[in-house]
Swiss-Prot record:
Keywords: Amino-acid biosynthesis, Arginine biosynthesis, ATP-binding, Cytoplasm, Kinase, Nucleotide-binding, Transferase
Stated name of the protein: Acetylglutamate kinase
PANTHER family, sorted: N-ACETYLGLUTAMATE SYNTHASE, N-ACETYLGLUTAMATE SYNTHASE, MITOCHONDRIAL
EC number: 2.7.2.8
Length: 264
């Protein structure tokens, strides 16, 4: 079975033009089948502020009202997605930009009230149709997927990019040996946020619960790890959380980097 790397990039990489350009050059050089999933929350937040709309976040997830939905659709599906595609094309990586609505790749349902919180137009993934992605990969085309899905009734939904990446990984397990990689600005999951070298090399479900209870893992890292363990339990070959600069070492040079998520 062929390998497939599903790589999610986020954090400060998207916001830093030099870091993003360097990362995309590395991504383009990867020899295996690959899909890129991107976030972009900080860009959307800046544009929201400029328009007088204050971003609201709960546990790393954005609350999306009707006006914010317009902004994230423009920013995620347009500005960020197409800039990434253009940069990949300049590195001889034939990429195509997509949302979950394109080719009906990813259907979601609007999240119901959760603990009294109305997340607005936020989608919880209910169905992934991997065949269009399999076809694109077979033609040597690299999908670049924005964190937007649709409800099947004409409404776009903002969807956590980590979730999009893990759901794609699970859906493509039947066709590929899928490896899920979360790339951001840190070297991995840190035991001490003040010590950027305090990388936790492996985390299993038991140590994850312990790290959450002691506050070592919190905020936006929680949905990332929740999605990671869901993917492992569903048959994804490996999940790595690492620094964007380590991507070539990990994939082309087969080196050990970052934090690896493992089953008990």
């Amino acid at each position: 079975m062929q390998k497939l790397y599903i790589i999610k990039v986020g954090g400060n990489i998207i916001d830093n033009p030099e870091a993003l350009t360097s990362f995309l050059k590395d991504f383009a050089s990867l020899k295996e089948n690959k899909i890129l999933v991107h976030g972009g929350g900080k860009v959307a937040t800046e544009i929201s502020k400029g328009l007088g709309i204050e971003a609201q976040m709960v546990d790393g997830r954005r609350i999306t009202d009707a006006e914010t939905l317009k902004i994230v659709t423009m920013v995620y599906g347009g500005l960020i997605n197409k800039n990434i595609v253009a940069k990949l094309q300049s590195n001889e990586c034939n990429a195509i930009g997509l949302t979950g609505a394109d080719a009906n790749i990813m259907l979601s349902s609007k999240r119901p009230l959760k603990n009294g919180i109305d997340y607005g137009f936020v989608g919880d993934v209910k169905k992934v149709h991997p065949q269009p992605l399999i076809h694109l990969l077979s033609q040597g085309i690299t999908p670049v997927v924005a964190p937007l899905t649709h409800d099947g009734n004409g409404t776009m939904l903002n969807t956590n990019a980590d979730t999009v990446a893990s759901e794609l990984a699970v859906a493509l397990c039947g066709a590929f040996a899928v490896n899920l990689v979360y790339c951001f600005e840190l070297k991995g999951v840190l035991r001490d946020f003040e010590d950027k070298d305090s990388v936790i090399s492996t985390i299993n479900p038991d140590t994850y619960e312990e790290l959450k209870s002691t506050g070592v893992i919190n905020k936006g890292m929680i949905p990332k790890l929740d999605n990671s363990f869901n993917a492992i339990n569903a048959g994804v070959s490996s999940v790595i959380i690492c620094q964007a600069e380590s991507l070539v070492e990990l994939i082309n040079e087969n080196k050990t980097v970052g934090t690896k998520l493992v089953a008990n």
